[in-house]
Design a protein with these regions (language model features):
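N-terminal non-globular leader segments, chiefly Sec-dependent signal peptides
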Residues: 1-59, 98-111
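Short, compact, well-ordered microdomains
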Residues: 60-110
Length: 111
């Protein structure tokens, strides 16, 4: 069950536009576990509203002004609505790993 604050943040995220991306789901209480995005997903094909999501491996992280977008090996582009405790730290850790990988010319990238 979403709190009132989470509902407002989700509504705000649903109204935002990303001209270069097609959002396939909105994730609440997000965190990164083993290079996958975990949380409750909304407005995602094949998932019930609020169903637990474990994404495919993350291939790209995009930071917009107010929101993080996550692309996966499955072709999903997921918008993070809110973080679970420690979730932002886990994303920033993965971001640092992607930056290091870019120096080594790896296929993983950050935008």
């Amino acid at each position: 069950m979403l709190t009132r604050h989470q509902k407002l943040r989700l509504a705000d995220a649903l109204l935002e536009r990303y001209p270069d991306e097609v959002i396939t789901g909105y994730v609440v209480n997000a965190r990164i576990v083993s290079a996958c995005l975990v949380g409750k997903v909304y407005q995602a094909w094949g998932y019930a509203q609020g169903e637990r999501l474990v994404s495919g491996a993350i291939t790209r992280i995009i930071q917009y002004e107010r929101r993080w977008l996550i692309e996966t090996t499955e072709g999903d582009c997921l918008a993070i609505v809110s973080f679970a405790p420690g979730g932002r730290r886990s994303l920033l850790h993965l971001t640092a790993l992607f930056e290091t990988a870019a120096l080594a010319h790896s296929r993983w990238c950050l935008h």
